């Protein structure tokens, strides 16, 4: 099994094989907690306009995320796991957009399969990779705003 560690949006664009897009502190920790709170589905999108358009077409969807570290007006929740810890998300569909993590998911067009990575789901990722035994794994560290590498994402990949 070959493992490549890539960085930022350019890394996501070059990712192949089983791809783990890593955004430790916010996006994918929030995603893990959202599923833990009963969310049925998370739809990652690259930008605020797409998120709001999906909400307009599907008023029962919840919109979660941030732009420049701030909750966007009209969104149901920001991008911190603490924003959803007490929320009942049972059977909810969440539209999620962030400055880093969801942009990586959308950019990983050449991946065979894409999963999200964070410390909160690291053991599940390891078990999944062991089970799948892919010939190539790409670990994509999304960094701060998908433009500056950060230690926590790199540590998670290591």
Task: Please provide the spans of the model-predicted regions.
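A short acidic-Thr-Gly-centered motif at the start of a beta-strand
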Residues: 4-14
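Short acidic, Gly/Ser-rich segments with clustered Asp/Glu that frequently serve as metal-coordination loops
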Residues: 11-12, 19-31
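A glycine-biased structural micro-motif
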Residues: 16-17, 91
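Conserved beta-strand elements of the Class I
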Residues: 18-20, 62, 138
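Domain-level signal for Mg2+-assisted phosphodiester chemistry and nucleotide/NA-binding surfaces
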Residues: 37-42
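Acidic/Gly/His-enriched mid-domain segments of enzyme catalytic cores or analogous surface patches
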Residues: 43-132
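Active-site rim beta-loop-alpha module in soluble metabolic enzymes
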Residues: 136-158
